[in-house]
């Protein structure tokens, strides 16, 4: 079943088409370090973008991090994601794995990634290999280092903005709203700065351009092949920073003299591209990334600007540290949500039947919404990625079994609600209130089950290795006596909708 694009997706696509139409056959200008105005433009238009060259990082940390990348690659722990973009399933050209705080997740392109946990204090984590455990510990060490560097960079940015307060241009009033760290740097700002750099996950990336001959061309500036298209990073705490450690494998690290006369960027060297969102006046930047370089996107840069990754000729790893927005994205969160639904189940029933305490519409509506959340945001997201996480750790096995057991109890709760709707003697008004409360969730459940089932059977899904093949789970056949309701809810939804229509005058 084809998903209807969201209003945000439609608006983004319309902006892109308008921009391409406006450009026609011309390229927008962009700058590289070879251009005289490159650093001036960076300072004026991209002041919240910071580059730390490899020489500023200790050799010991470089060695550990680069060995950790190779370890994760050697053990087959990086995977191309089967993502959903505008209703189409696509395999990302970049292979990834999420490492971070135990129980955290990170969602991008309608795909929820689950952390391979790093060893935070007080945790007891088992990895499948000692080398993988050591690699995760190294990325936690890198995380700590990048956090310190980010806090320092944010403090420097705040100090610069503070120093500029007294030099307000004549055309700007003193109370003109400022974008940035704020006009008064104080103790609260210090707390804010630390929270904006409190990285809880890193998304590891790997790509070998030699094995990806069909990479897209950058469409606006003519920057060449892209490993990652123009985007804002998703699912982050507002105004939080992003820190990236880049490691391109052995190859041409410097431009040769023969290339110095070429316009634009050197296609053999990896670059990160930046542009102001939907701005065709300001030149873009293409910043070369050499082995061990780090860059930082501070404050609201990720919201006001877009970035892309421009492929070089050699394989490249990166570790991208983020403050993932986890208010609805941790195991603790979803377990707490799942505890709400069973609170409506009576405990004094002797057999396996489920009896409900309340048929209040608001209570039933909340229960069905939680039912959908655990099924489609957690269980199906996890199993759609096959058994990939077992390559690194079994940390998620028990929690997923627990969530599935809670979900199964919710199926029984839904069944009890449907029995109540059919009960003879139930007042019509009360029946209609119940139907109105649950119908939207049941309709969404049916549509989403059909969509996820189709995605698992798609041609591209069938090409994946056995341990990465999507699994449509939970799934059961009609004759499965252990399940109170069918997998396919088409008939039930149709019947409920008909009852509601009949009741209307």
UniProtKB/Swiss-Prot annotation:
Q: Does the keyword DNA-binding apply?
A: no
Organism annotation: Pongo abelii (Sumatran orangutan)
Q: Which gene encodes it?
A: FTO
Family (UniProt): Belongs to the fto family.
Spell out which residues are annotated as carrying Phosphothreonine.
4
Q: Which cofactor does it need?
A: Fe(2+)
Q: Which residues bind substrate?
A: 96, 108, 231-234
InterPro entries to which the protein is assigned, alphabetical: AlkB-like_sf (IPR037151), FTO (IPR032868), FTO_C (IPR024366), FTO_C_sf (IPR038413), FTO_cat_dom (IPR024367)
**Could you say how this protein's activity is regulated?**
Activated by ascorbate. Inhibited by N-oxalylglycine, fumarate and succinate.
What reaction(s) does this enzyme catalyze?
a 5'-end (N(7)-methyl 5'-triphosphoguanosine)-(N(6),2'-O-dimethyladenosine) in mRNA + 2-oxoglutarate + O2 = a 5'-end (N(7)-methyl 5'-triphosphoguanosine)-(2'-O-methyladenosine) in mRNA + formaldehyde + succinate + CO2; an N(6)-methyladenosine in mRNA + 2-oxoglutarate + O2 = an adenosine in mRNA + formaldehyde + succinate + CO2; N(6)-methyladenosine in U6 snRNA + 2-oxoglutarate + O2 = adenosine in U6 snRNA + formaldehyde + succinate + CO2; a 5'-end (N(7)-methyl 5'-triphosphoguanosine)-(N(6),2'-O-dimethyladenosine) in U6 snRNA + 2-oxoglutarate + O2 = a 5'-end (N(7)-methyl 5'-triphosphoguanosine)-(2'-O-methyladenosine) in U6 snRNA + formaldehyde + succinate + CO2
Tell me where on the tree of life, at the top rank, the source sits: Eukaryota
Entry note: cofactor = Binds 1 Fe(2+) ion per subunit.
Which residues does the record give as Fe cation binding sites?
A: 231, 233, 307
> Which intervals of the chain are annotated as region Loop L1?
213-224
Sorted alphabetically, the Gene Ontology cellular component annotations on this record are:
cytoplasm; nuclear speck; nucleus
Q: Which PANTHER family does the record match to this protein? A: ALPHA-KETOGLUTARATE-DEPENDENT DIOXYGENASE FTO
Q: A Pfam family this protein belongs to?
A: FTO_NTD
Q: Which UniProt keywords apply?
A: Acetylation, Cytoplasm, Dioxygenase, Iron, Metal-binding, Nucleus, Oxidoreductase, Phosphoprotein
Where in the cell is the protein located?
A: Nucleus; Nucleus speckle; Cytoplasm
Q: Provide the protein name.
A: Alpha-ketoglutarate-dependent dioxygenase FTO
Q: How does it assemble?
A: Monomer. May also exist as homodimer.
Q: Assign the protein's first listed, main location to one coarse class.
A: nucleus
Q: Name one GO biological process term.
A: RNA repair
Notes on the domains: The 3D-structure of the Fe2OG dioxygenase domain is similar to that of the Fe2OG dioxygenase domain found in the bacterial DNA repair dioxygenase alkB and its mammalian orthologs, but sequence similarity is very low. As a consequence, the domain is not detected by protein signature databases.
Where in the sequence is N6-acetyllysine found?
A: 216
């Amino acid at each position: 079943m084809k998903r209807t694009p969201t209003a945000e997706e439609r608006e983004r696509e319309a902006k892109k088409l308008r921009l391409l139409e406006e450009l026609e056959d011309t390229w927008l200008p962009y700058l590289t370090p070879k251009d005289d105005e490159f650093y001036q433009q960076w300072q004026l238009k991209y002041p919240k973008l910071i580059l730390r060259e490899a020489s500023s990082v200790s050799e010991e940390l470089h060695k550990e991090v680069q060995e950790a990348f190779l370890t994760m690659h050697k053990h087959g722990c990086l995977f191309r994601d089967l993502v959903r973009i505008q209703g189409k399933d696509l395999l990302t050209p970049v292979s990834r794995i999420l490492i971070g705080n135990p129980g955290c997740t990170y969602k991008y392109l309608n795909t929820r990634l689950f952390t391979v946990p790093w060893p935070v204090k007080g945790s007891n984590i088992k990895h499948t290999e000692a080398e993988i455990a050591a690699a995760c510990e190294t990325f936690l060490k890198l995380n700590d280092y990048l956090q310190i560097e980010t806090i320092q960079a944010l403090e420097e940015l705040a100090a610069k903005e503070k120093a500029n307060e007294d030099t307000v241009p004549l055309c700007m009033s003193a109370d003109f709203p400022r974008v940035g760290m704020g006009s008064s740097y104080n103790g609260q700002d210090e707390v804010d700065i630390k929270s904006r750099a409190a990285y809880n996950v890193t998304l590891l990336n790997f790509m070998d351009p030699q094995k990806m001959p069909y990479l897209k061309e950058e469409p606006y500036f003519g920057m060449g092949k892209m490993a990652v298209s123009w985007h804002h990073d998703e699912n982050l705490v507002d105004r939080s920073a992003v820190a990236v450690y880049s490691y391109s494998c052995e190859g041409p690290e410097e431009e040769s003299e023969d290339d110095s006369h070429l316009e634009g960027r050197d296609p053999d060297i990896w670059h990160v591209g930046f542009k102001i969102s939907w701005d065709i006046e300001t030149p873009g930047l293409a910043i070369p990334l050499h082995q061990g370089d780090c860059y930082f996107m501070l404050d609201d840069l990720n919201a006001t600007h877009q970035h892309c990754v421009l492929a070089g000729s050699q394989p490249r790893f990166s570790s991208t540290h983020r403050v993932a927005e986890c208010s609805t994205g941790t195991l603790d969160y979803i377990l707490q949500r799942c505890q709400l639904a069973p609170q409506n189940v009576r405990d004094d029933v002797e057999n396996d039947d489920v009896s409900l305490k309340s048929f209040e519409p608001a209570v039933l509506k909340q229960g069905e919404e939680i039912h959908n959340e655990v099924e489609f945001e957690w269980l199906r997201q996890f199993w759609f990625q096959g058994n990939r996480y077992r390559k690194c750790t079994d940390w998620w096995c028990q929690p997923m079994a627990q969530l599935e057991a809670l979900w199964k109890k919710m199926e029984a709760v839904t069944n009890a609600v449907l029995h109540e709707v059919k009960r003879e003697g139930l007042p019509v008004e009360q029946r209609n209130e119940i139907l109105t409360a649950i119908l939207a969730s049941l309709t969404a459940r049916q549509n989403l089950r059909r969509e996820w089932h189709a995605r698992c059977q798609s041609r591209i899904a069938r090409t994946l290795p056995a341990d990465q093949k999507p699994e449509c789970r939970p799934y059961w056949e009609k004759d499965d006596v252990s399940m109170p309701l069918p997998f396919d809810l088409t008939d039930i939804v149709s019947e409920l909708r008909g009852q509601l229509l009949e009741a209307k005058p």
